[in-house]
A protein has these predicted regions:
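Phosphate-coordination/substrate-recognition cap region in phosphate-metabolizing enzymes
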Residues: 34-116
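Short glycine/proline- and acidic residue-enriched helix-loop micro-motifs
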Residues: 100-140
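Generic beta-sheet signal
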Residues: 4, 45, 162-168
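Loop-to-helix element that buttresses phosphate recognition and phosphoryl-transfer chemistry
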Residues: 3-6, 10-65, 137-145
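Active-site metal-binding loops of divalent metal-dependent hydrolases
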Residues: 10, 170-171, 216-219
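Conserved beta-strand termini and adjacent loop/short-helix elements that scaffold enzyme active sites
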Residues: 7, 75-77, 215
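Short, well-ordered beta-to-alpha junction loops that form the rim of enzyme active sites
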Residues: 51-52, 77, 164-171
């Protein structure tokens, strides 16, 4: 049996010119994650990351809490969809990073404001399965994630690790879970919205079958510091 831990990256720099880097809080989350994993893991894990900066930063900071060197395998298949493209296709004003930053600064509940954009933007994306507006369609994104999962299972068969860490993003993790449970696009979007930064979703690979064991665990963040838990 192999336990697979799907990990969402730490808080990135949403609303800034370079989203794809961890915020100070995201870095603190990654270190807390590393301390949690150090106590959780029983063996030296097989490690996979997406190729995005936030994936690799999260992995590097988390693994810095360990006392042994560990190598990582990187694959673009585990990268997030282009959220900027999806959001701006729905609301063109969001192409201006300063506009988005101003909107968020004016909101007492920024996450609730983004929710009013996120769901219709994702719905629009899922209904447009041609290359007219999007470089990657919803169906292509799902197929890519399923390919990532297939290749991971092949690597597990080859290397026979007991534990695997995958550092990726909320959209990817939600598609994996939805694929295993047979969920609709709408339910997938709802899962994505609830996945916390540096949360851990656990799968079990046994007898050539993959099953969901737990979803979106981030209790260890609360144990470290009350305000470390974030979703944006």
């Amino acid at each position: 049996m192999t336990q697979i831990y799907l990990i969402r990256h730490g808080q990135a720099s949403f609303g800034t010119a370079n989203y794809d880097q961890l915020s100070d809080k995201g870095q603190a989350q990654a270190h807390a994650l590393g301390r949690y994993l150090k106590n959780l893991l029983q063996t030296k894990p097989y490690i996979v990351t997406g190729s995005m900066q936030r994936h690799q930063q999260t992995a590097q900071l988390a693994l810095s809490e360990f006392t042994i060197e560990m190598s990582m395998y990187s694959s673009e298949l585990w990268n997030e969809f282009n959220h900027h493209e999806v959001l701006t296709a729905y609301e063109p004003k969001l192409a201006d990073v300063e506009f988005l930053g101003q909107q968020l600064a004016q909101c007492s509940e920024p996450r609730e404001y983004l929710k009013t954009i996120f769901y219709p933007a994702m719905q629009q994306w899922s209904e447009h399965n041609n290359h007219g507006e999007y470089q990657e369609t919803w169906l292509q994104f799902k197929a890519r994630v399923q390919q990532a999962l297939y290749e991971l299972c092949s690597q597990i068969q080859r290397h026979q690790p007991k534990e695997v860490l995958v550092f990726s993003s909320g959209g990817v993790i939600s598609v994996v879970v939805a694929h295993l449970l047979g969920l609709s696009a709408e339910r997938t979007f709802a899962l994505n919205w609830e996945i916390a930064n540096t949360s851990v979703t656990m799968l079990k690979w046994q007898n050539e079958q993959l099953n969901l064991h737990s979803f979106n665990e981030y209790h260890y963040l609360k144990d470290n510091q009350a305000d470390l838990t974030t979703w944006l």
